[in-house]
Amino acid sequence: QITYTKGIPRPVYSPIAAAQIPVVAGQVPLSYQPIAASRTVDPQYDPNPQYTFSYNVDDPETGDSKSQEETRNGDNVQGRYSVIESDGSRRVVEYSADAVSGFNAVVHREAGAAPPPPAVVRSAYQPVAYKSAPVAYSDVPAARYIQPVYNPVPLQYKSAPVAYSEVPAVRYKRPIAIPAGVRTSFTAPFGNYAY
């Protein structure tokens, strides 16, 4: 049981909190027989893997030129790859990997021809030739009126006379309120209130 107070919690020991766990003694065997571990070997596992692969790409349209070849015999891997850089030089990397030396690579750079010019992309679309028709302008004479369209009638304004009259005020007697003799009080655990 831990009691939390201000600061660091400290354990508080209580005889009630201690659990009594009964121990059951069983029969102990006199000798142990080891369980025979059965080892299963994956039928597709090859303890001495071997392979060889290579590829070569030479695309004159995009200028992509690279190649790679690699051979593996067990844990020993040897290979090389080359790529044509953007400046026309050729980078060749020869590498090997084994359990003793790890991975090692040697990089050579060979001067090459100038980089190929970028591929010319021709558009199949041609601009459409069009000719706009000439615009004809002509003056339209302004309309003239010989007589006015409407005849204005003069307006006369008259204000109505204003009459004021007083309305007598309504008066009434209000009864005087007398407080009732009722008193209400409340009692709560922390104080008393009375109204």
UniProtKB/Swiss-Prot annotation:
Domain Chitin-binding type R&R per the UniProt entry, residue ranges: 48-118
InterPro entries (alphabetical): CHIT_BIND_RR_consensus, Insect_cuticle, Insect_Cuticle_Struc_Prot
Biased composition (Basic and acidic residues): 63-73
GO CC terms, sorted: extracellular matrix; extracellular space
UniProt KW Metal-binding keyword: no
A GO term, aspect molecular function: structural constituent of cuticle
Pyrrolidone carboxylic acid modifications at: Q1
Keywords: Cuticle, Pyrrolidone carboxylic acid
Cited Pfam families: Chitin_bind_4
Region of interest (Disordered), ranges: 38-78
Protein name in the entry: Cuticle protein 8
Natural source organism: Blaberus craniifer (Death's head cockroach)
Organism placement in taxonomy: Eukaryota, Metazoa, Ecdysozoa, Arthropoda, Hexapoda
